[in-house]
């Protein structure tokens, strides 16, 4: 399981250090793709395969499903850790997530999210305001 928040710098070649706490759970190879809210989603291969099967089962005749699957998979790339524990983020993913220098890696249960520091700060402020009402809504779901 992934949890926590870590600030790291992206170097001039587009490489980002993956926190040691995330490395073992991610494994040597994993998948990064365009996430929601202009962050990147990073999945261990086993989690990716489960998600891939669910997305493959969506009806391609439905425009929303087709658009989501197309966008999600078009940004997907297999990543490997180098000997220094870094990943190379492709330019298209860095551009999508507005990643320039400072990145925040966030553990979200079954995945890691990579955010630009500025977008994460904005998102966190907004999420903090909605946190209490979201908690109240989750009570209705038995959580």
Swiss-Prot record:
Gene Ontology terms: biological process: negative regulation of DNA-templated transcription initiation
Keywords: Cytoplasm, DNA-binding, Repeat, Transcription, Transcription regulation
UniProt gene name: mraZ
Gene Ontology MF terms: DNA-binding transcription factor activity; transcription cis-regulatory region binding
One Pfam assignment: MraZ
Quaternary context: Forms oligomers.
Family to which the UniProt record says this protein belongs: Belongs to the MraZ family.
This protein's GO CC annotations: cytoplasm; nucleoid
SS bond partners: none
Signal peptide positions (record): none
Lineage top rank: taxon: Bacteria
PANTHER family: TRANSCRIPTIONAL REGULATOR MRAZ
Protein name: Transcriptional regulator MraZ
Subcellular location: Cytoplasm, Nucleoid
InterPro entries for the chain: MraZ (IPR003444), MraZ_C (IPR035644), MraZ_dom (IPR020603), MraZ_N (IPR035642), MraZ_sf (IPR038619), SpoVT-AbrB_dom (IPR007159), SpoVT-AbrB_sf (IPR037914)
Coiled-coil annotated residue ranges, if any: none
Domain (SpoVT-AbrB): residue spans on this chain: 5-47, 76-119
HAMAP family: MraZ
């Amino acid at each position: 399981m992934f949890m926590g928040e870590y600030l790291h710098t992206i170097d001039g070649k587009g490489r980002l250090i993956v926190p040691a706490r995330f490395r073992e759970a991610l494994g040597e190879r994993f998948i990064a793709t365009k996430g929601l809210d202009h962050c990147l989603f990073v999945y261990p291969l086993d989690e990716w395969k489960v998600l891939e099967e669910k997305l493959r089962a969506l009806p391609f005749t439905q425009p929303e499903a087709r658009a989501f699957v197309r966008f999600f998979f078009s940004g997907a790339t297999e990543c490997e850790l180098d000997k220094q524990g870094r990943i190379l983020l492709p330019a298209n993913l860095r551009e999508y997530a507005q990643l320039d220098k400072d990145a925040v890696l966030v553990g979200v249960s079954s995945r890691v999210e990579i955010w630009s520091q500025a977008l994460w700060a904005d998102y966190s402020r907004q999420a903090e305001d909605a946190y209490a009402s979201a908690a109240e809504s989750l009570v209705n779901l038995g959580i």
